[in-house]
């Protein structure tokens, strides 16, 4: 019997994996999240999910199956990661205001024998944001730990006018695709 492990400290990923009905343990892999200069957003998010899964596998028993995931927001070809401070979040949210952007979530499932990955891209449209809305949103504390400085599942959902793709992928773990990957291992 294989033990399932989530290599992530994200409460949203924990909730989503539990929503699929799986029982799992959690490990916190320590990897450096730094985009290489020539790397595309899809290559970057895929590499991070693979590194998280592999680092997680190194922390658990050989018979484990490990899920690693990462999410990035992309606007104008630029990767928007977690903000470091208010000015960072303000810049990102102003850039996303009244436009479309992409949210890319990569999932990697790995065992001692094999590894499978997928990148899910969702198109997201934002309403026009005022500076007051951006400041109030920052004061809520929600943007601090989120790629692109917003969480669609929280207060940031009020900014989203439309999505095309996977809502759960925008939150942090695409349910359908993750379940399909896990069925290749379990």
From Swiss-Prot:
One of its GO terms (biological process) is nucleotide metabolic process. It is found in: Cytoplasm. One of its GO terms (cellular component) is cytoplasm. Gene3D superfamilies: 3.90.950.10. It catalyses: dTTP + H2O = dTMP + diphosphate + H(+); UTP + H2O = UMP + diphosphate + H(+). The active site is at 70 (proton acceptor). HAMAP family: Maf. This is dTTP/UTP pyrophosphatase. It comes from Vibrio vulnificus (strain YJ016).
């Amino acid at each position: 019997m294989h033990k399932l492990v989530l290599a992530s400290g994200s409460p949203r990923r924990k909730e989503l994996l539990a929503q699929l009905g799986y029982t799992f343990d959690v490990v916190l892999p320590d990897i450096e999240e730094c985009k290489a200069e020539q790397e595309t957003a899809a290559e970057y998010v895929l590499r991070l999910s693979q590194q998280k899964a592999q680092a997680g596998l190194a922390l658990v028993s050989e018979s484990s199956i490990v899920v690693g995931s990462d999410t990035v927001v992309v606007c104008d070809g630029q990767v928007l990661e977690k903000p470091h401070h208010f000015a960072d979040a303000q810049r990102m949210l102003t850039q996303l205001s009244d436009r479309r952007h992409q949210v890319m979530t990569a999932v990697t499932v790995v065992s001692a024998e094999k590894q499978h990955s997928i990148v899910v891209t969702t198109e997201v449209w934002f309403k026009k944001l005022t500076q007051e809305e951006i400041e109030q949103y920052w004061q809520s504390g929600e943007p601090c730990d989120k790629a692109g400085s917003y969480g669609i599942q929280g207060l940031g959902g009020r900014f989203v006018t439309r999505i095309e793709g996977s809502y759960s992928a925008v939150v942090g773990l695409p349910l359908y695709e993750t379940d399909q990957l896990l069925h290749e291992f379990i």
